[in-house]
């Protein structure tokens, strides 16, 4: 196809600038050309000299390795903050994203309110979600799941190349954390006062790994990973060690209630936060067990007490998660509710009795 470049732009800061001089090799630029309306560029196409039409090797876009369920927000706090809250808004926005997000895929779920979105990992999907959040969307997402393929009759999963750079004294901790997630040590190189550790690890082992490593290394770890290939399934990994603290009633959390329940585990909420029944408001210290608690009870007043006495209740600081941390934290029976102003973790089934019935029907013992 013959055409002529009319304008040439280079990127400067957050914008772009038109230039009339040639660009150097390696520079990123944008071009404006006259094109037939029936002709479109594809990823990997080459713009070259008409007298020397030699195309570069085509660029291969990596396939998705992870999926998440995107659905409308149907929590009791639905529609209080967002501008775009309906299934039509959600579907239109996600399908519009397909036009520019080349590594993303969308699959119908059979429900008009939900879509299965495939991406290149937690960070890839979190960028999309954060963008939608800032645009005024309300939505919920499910637990991220890696894509499983059957190759030559064998169950296979995506494997990533993981590189961790840490001070030497933390190297043993890093190896312990990664190998517990089915990671395998590759090479160990010393670079000054730091050690570079290379691993191969299943993509599902990457979920939640960054925060664990930063905690284990006092924030010193530098972490990078990329997709390597599909390999045979590495076996099951340990799930969440602890259960969840679940709100029993809808209302405003009080310092009095939270202070009395500090021994149950750390909280994700603070006094004055509004919660609803079925919301995950903390982490239970009872391994594997969820605990339903009431955090909206206020101190009963008598003629010997005043309302200001409630303010003397002491509470430990709440755990505040980023979007990526919350996406990595949620379990199979939970959703992450995302609004322009809040992130909330909730049980998919909000009603306590219905939740217990579902567990029994699924073969779990009652809590």
Residue ranges, per PLM feature:
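Short, surface-exposed ligand-recognition loops at beta-strand->loop->(often short) alpha-helix junctions
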Residues: 73-86, 162-170
């Amino acid at each position: 196809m013959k055409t002529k470049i009319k304008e040439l732009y280079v990127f400067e800061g957050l914008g772009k600038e038109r230039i009339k001089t040639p660009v150097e090799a390696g520079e990123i630029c944008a071009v404006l050309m006259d094109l037939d309306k029936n002709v479109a560029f594809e990823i990997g196409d080459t713009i070259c000299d008409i007298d020397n039409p030699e195309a570069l090797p085509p660029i291969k876009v990596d396939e998705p390795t992870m999926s998440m369920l995107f659905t409308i927000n149907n929590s009791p706090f639905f529609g209080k903050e967002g501008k775009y809250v309906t299934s039509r808004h959600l579907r239109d926005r996600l399908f519009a994203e397909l036009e520019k997000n080349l590594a993303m895929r969308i699959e119908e779920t059979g429900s008009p309110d939900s879509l299965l979105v495939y991406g290149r990992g937690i960070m890839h999907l979190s960028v999309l979600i954060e963008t939608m959040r800032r645009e005024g969307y309300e939505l919920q997402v499910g637990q991220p799941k890696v894509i499983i393929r059957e190759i030559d009759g064998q169950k296979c999963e995506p494997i990533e190349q993981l590189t961790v750079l840490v001070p030497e004294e933390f190297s043993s901790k890093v190896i312990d954390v990664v190998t517990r997630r089915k990671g395998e040590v590759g090479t160990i190189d010393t670079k000054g006062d730091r050690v570079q550790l290379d691993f191969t690890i299943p993509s599902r082992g990457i979920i939640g790994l960054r925060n664990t490593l930063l905690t284990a290394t006092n924030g010193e770890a530098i972490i990078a990973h990329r997709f390597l290939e599909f390999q045979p399934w590495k076996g099951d990994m340990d799930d969440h060690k602890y259960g969840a603290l679940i709100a029993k009633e809808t209302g405003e959390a009080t310092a009095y209630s939270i202070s009395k329940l500090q021994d149950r585990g750390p909280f994700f909420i603070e006094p004055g936060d509004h919660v609803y029944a079925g919301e995950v408001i903390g982490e239970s210290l009872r391994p594997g067990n969820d605990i339903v608690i009431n955090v909206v009870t206020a101190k009963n007043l008598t003629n010997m007490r005043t309302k200001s006495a409630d303010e003397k209740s002491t509470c430990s600081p709440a755990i505040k998660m980023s979007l990526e941390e919350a996406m990595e934290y949620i379990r199979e029976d939970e959703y992450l509710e995302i609004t322009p102003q809040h992130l909330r973790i909730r049980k998919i089934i909000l009603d306590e009795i219905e939740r217990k019935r579902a567990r029994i029907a699924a073969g779990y013992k009652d809590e």
